[in-house]
A protein has these predicted regions:
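Bacterial N-terminal signal peptides that target proteins for export
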Residues: 1-7
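A generic "folded-domain core" signal
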Residues: 21-166
């Protein structure tokens, strides 16, 4: 059993699908994922939106020491901003347990969701290489996230991140 390291940092996730935010510049797109450069934080993130308008975002914190994965929906949820709950994430044969932080109100109107933080390189590797992520929140029903294309999107984000430092 592996553990997700959670720090409870406030991350400015989901700013409308990010494209409309002033500080985010579209960097590129690959296999259904958009890559954005955050001009303020000098980091990059990847984002995918499914047919039901659910949004998945992944990136690095401003200090680049920790990665995040956020999942947001327009569906009705009981998620409260800042509320933390236990979560387990299955990626291939690996289960990661930790804490998810809820977001509502400070993100795009009509969306709620949460994010996890991790500094485990295996977690990032599994996200890049697996096709599906199964999330088991403490209070809600389990759900799956399609990870198709994450490997190439994460590669593009790495290049984007390197360019932000230059």
């Amino acid at each position: 059993l592996k553990r997700i390291i959670t720090l409870g940092l406030a991350i400015g996730l989901l700013t409308s699908t990010v494209a409309s935010a002033d500080t985010f510049l579209r960097y590129g797109e690959v296999e259904g994922w958009k890559v954005f450069a955050d001009q303020d934080k000098k980091t990059c993130l990847i984002e995918a939106v499914d047919d039901a308008e659910n949004v998945v975002q992944m990136g690095l914190t401003e200090d680049r020491g920790v990665g995040y994965v956020g999942v947001f929906t327009k569906a009705e949820t009981d998620i409260k901003r800042g509320e933390k709950e236990a979560v387990a994430i299955l990626l291939g044969d690996n289960i990661y347990v930790g804490e998810a932080t809820g977001m509502k109100g400070n993100i795009t109107k009509g969306y709620s969701g949460g994010y996890v933080l991790s500094d485990d390189p295996q977690f990032a590797d599994d996200i890049a290489k697996q096709k599906v992520m199964v999330v088991f929140p403490e209070k809600e029903f389990a759900f799956t996230v399609d990870l198709t294309g994450t490997y190439k999107a994460m590669e593009m984000a790495r290049k984007c991140n390197e360019e932000q430092l230059g």
